[in-house]
Structure formats: structure tokens, C-alpha cells
């Protein structure tokens, strides 16, 4: 089968949708399928512009859902997409975030084969979130595009609930996956962090909705009980400099901002963590980073938001705390550090949970859905031909 995977976001920058598309491509190729990825790409960061990626053009950064999305806005985009589709002759085109402006919408307009859309987004808290306004205000324009989809996937029940409020339909829930060969308890920790201190890890962009400031505010309460605790913050973002200045003003030691960490090195940070903490305030359709922590053997403390609650079972394989509540967050981290049997229980349960989300299983579910849609199309075509006769 020849499959075209489409990402509307800049392939040069790391992100959840990009990783999802890349893992699907790798799994499909391993199955023996022919795969191309259509995506914009604007910069040299990382090893990204290589086969099977078809670079569609440059991007423009715009704020979406409490984050920054780099998407392609180009008047010649439709012509470029049409040429690629005519050349490649895909059996299935799978568009991720199909209603995002730019490449996704252009592919929907031009596609003449079975077209699948995966919806990753949920709303950021508040009626006036960007994603809410975009869907509500652009509904008359987006509805005809949505109807061009032969099949719809949502990465979680949360994502399905959000998009179906505006675009009702039959959604297949197929989650994000986790790479168990990459994230594993067998990974060697970073030696500089294996000095007897406890390590609390945060991984994510420094944006408002990721909630890093709530972990920073929890540091004094955690250190009151466990003074020899190190805090590792992995990621980049516009708020990072302000957070670093805050730490400097407090005079805190062992609060480390590691910056951008390449994907190949990230598992060693997870392997070094005694507790993984993700205090996001919303806008998360599913907790992929939580699965990466679980697969690495790091017990999880996270915010009790709908996207995270689809991954973590409270008190069974992690602790969920009230969003924006640094006191409760500090209590949960201290409780895990203080109760080693519970920490080990969460490690064991998390490893089991991660196995349920292994990419080969997830990719096979997507492939099975493709086959269902292709069979439906063949049946429909035969019916139309028989009626014509």
C-alpha cells in the first residue's frame, strides 16, 4: 500500500504531531508499505529533512491553543500539493490535524483517494481559547472540508469530545504510542545525577499551559521535607529565561535548566528521575510524555486534566493533582519520595501501562482502519457501477 502522511506543522521543530507521524511512518515501512510524509520545513534544526519527507515549503509561527504553531501559509500551496498527489498516486492519504490552515486543508481539497484525518487537539481551559474560537467562527468554511474525510481518528476520548462538539461524526479512538525500544528501564541514567540526591524531572516546552511555574513554586515545600532534591527542567520556550531569573533570585542550587535535549538523549533523563512531574494546566489531548516516563520506569505525578486522566489511573499507576495547585503538587511529590513501596508499585504498573501503547500495536490499529475504509470504498464503487448498468 502507498500511504501519504500529512503534518501541517514545521518538520524542523520537535512536537507531538511530528513524532506521531514519524512513528507511524516507521512502523508502516517496517510492515512493507511505501510511505511518504508531506510537511513544511523551515530550518536546519535536527536531522529532519530526509526520505521519506517531502518538504512542502516554509512556515509562519502563529499562536494556537496556548502554544506556538508553525504552519505553512502560501498562496501557491494548492498547486504544489496537486502536483505531489498526481505524481505519488497514494492509496490512502492520512492528514493529521486536518482542519488546521495551510497544508492540511490544501490536501483535503486536492485529495481524490481515501482520506483519513486524525484529530490531536483538545481545548485549552476557557471558552475563549484559540481552538474553540477557530472551530466556532470558521465552521461554515470548515464543514465542507470535514465532509471530505472518509474516516476520522481521535487520539483520545478527550480529543473526540472536543472536536465532535463542532463536527459530529463517527470517530475511531486510536491513541498516541510510545517507543519501547527508545524509552526503557534498561537505559543508563546520566552519571552526574546519580550522586544520592533525589531527582524530580519536568519535560516540556516552557509555555503557560505546560505549568512549569507550579513545580517551581512547589520547590520550597518539597525541600522542607527532602532538602537533597534536584530539579531537572528539560525543554525550551519563551518563558525559560524568566524562570531561570526567578531561580537565581531565590538563590536555589540544584535547579537545572537543561534546555533542548535531542530525542536520542532524552531517555537518559527519564532514567535518572526518581519522580516525573507534569503540572500542565490544560490543552493536552493525551499524555504522551507520561507514557514515555512510565516506559522508562519513572513514577508519575501529573495534573488531573482530562487528557492526562486518560493515561493515569489515580493511585494505581500515578498520582493526579488539582491543576494550578502547587501545594498539592508538592504533597504528591513528597508522598512518593517518602513511600518507596508505592513508588515501586507505580514503576511496575507504569511499565505495564506503557506496553499497551507500544507503537507496533497502535500502527496496526491504524492500518486495520485503513483497510476497512478501502473495503468500504470498493464496495461503494461496485454498487455505483451496478446501478449505472
Over which residues does each language-model region extend?
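N-terminal strand-loop element at the rim of the active site
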Residues: 7-14, 22, 26-73, 84
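Membrane-proximal helix-turn-helix segments that form the acceptor-binding/catalytic region
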Residues: 109, 123, 135-152, 165-166
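Conserved donor-binding/catalytic core segment of Leloir-type glycosyltransferases
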Residues: 153, 192-219
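Carbohydrate-associated surface elements
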Residues: 158, 177
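Nucleotide-activated donor-binding/catalytic signature segment of Leloir-type glycosyltransferases, i.e.
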Residues: 241-261
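Short alpha-helical donor nucleotide-sugar binding micro-motif in glycosyltransferases
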Residues: 260-261, 268-273
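Acidic donor-binding loop of glycosyltransferase active sites
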Residues: 271-285, 298
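Conserved acidic donor-binding segment of nucleotide-sugar-dependent glycosyltransferases
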Residues: 314-315, 319-326, 335-341
Amino acid at each position: 500500500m502507498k500511504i501519504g502522511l500529512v503534518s501541517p506543522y514545521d518538520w524542523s521543530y520537535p512536537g507531538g504531531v511530528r513524532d506521531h507521524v514519524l512513528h507511524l511512518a516507521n512502523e508502516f515501512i517496517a510492515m512493507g508499505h511505501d510511505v511518504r510524509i508531506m510537511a513544511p520545513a523551515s530550518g536546519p534544526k535536527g536531522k529532519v529533512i530526509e526520505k521519506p519527507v517531502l518538504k512542502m515549503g516554509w512556515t509562519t509561527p502563529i499562536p494556537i491553543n496556548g502554544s506556538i504553531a508553525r504552519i505553512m501559509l502560501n498562496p501557491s500551496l494548492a498547486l504544489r500539493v496537486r502536483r505531489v498527489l498526481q505524481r505519488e498516486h497514494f492509496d490512502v492519504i492520512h492528514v493529521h490535524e486536518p482542519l488546521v490552515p495551510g497544508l492540511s486543508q490544501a490536501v483535503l481539497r486536492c485529495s481524490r483517494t481515501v482520506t483519513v484525518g486524525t484529530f490531536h487537539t483538545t481545548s485549552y481551559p476557557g471558552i475563549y481559547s484559540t481552538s474553540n474560537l477557530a472551530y466556532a467562527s470558521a465552521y461554515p468554511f470548515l464543514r465542507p472540508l470535514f465532509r471530505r474525510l472518509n474516516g476520522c481518528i481521535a487520539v483520545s476520548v478527550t480529543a473526540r469530545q472536543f472536536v465532535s462538539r463542532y463536527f459530529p461524526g463517527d470517530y475511531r479512538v486510536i491513541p498516541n504510542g510510545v517507543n519501547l525500544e527508545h524509552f526503557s528501564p534498561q537505559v543508563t541514567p546520566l552519571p552526574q545525577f546519580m550522586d544520592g540526591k533525589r531527582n524530580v524531572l519536568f519535560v516540556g516546552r516552557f509555555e503557560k499551559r505546560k505549568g512549569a511555574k507550579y513545580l517551581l513554586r512547589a520547590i520550597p515545600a518539597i525541600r522542607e521535607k527532602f532538602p537533597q532534591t534536584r530539579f531537572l527542567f528539560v525543554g525550551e520556550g519563551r518563558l525559560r529565561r524568566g524562570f531561570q531569573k526567578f531561580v537565581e533570585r531565590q538563590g536555589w542550587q540544584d535547579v537545572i535548566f537543561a534546555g533542548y535535549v535531542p530525542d536520542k538523549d532524552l531517555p537518559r533523563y527519564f532514567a535518572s528521575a526518581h519522580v516525573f512531574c507534569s503540572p500542565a494546566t490544560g490543552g493536552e489531548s493525551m499524555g504522551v510524555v507520561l507514557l514515555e516516563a512510565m516506559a522508562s520506569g519513572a513514577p508519575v505525578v501529573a495534573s488531573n486534566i482530562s487528557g492526562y486522566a486518560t493515561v493515569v489511573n489515580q493511585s494505581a499507576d500515578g498520582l493526579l493533582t488539582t491543576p494550578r495547585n502547587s501545594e498539592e503538587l508538592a504533597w504528591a511529590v513528597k508522598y512518593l519520595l517518602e513511600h518507596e513501596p508505592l513508588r515501586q508499585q507505580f514503576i511496575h504498573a507504569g511499565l505495564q501501562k506503557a506496553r499497551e501503547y507500544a507503537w507496533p500495536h497502535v500502527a496496526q490499529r491504524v492500518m486495520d482502519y485503513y483497510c476497512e475504509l478501502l473495503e468500504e470504498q470498493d464496495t461503494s464503487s461496485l454498487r455505483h457501477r451496478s446501478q449505472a448498468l
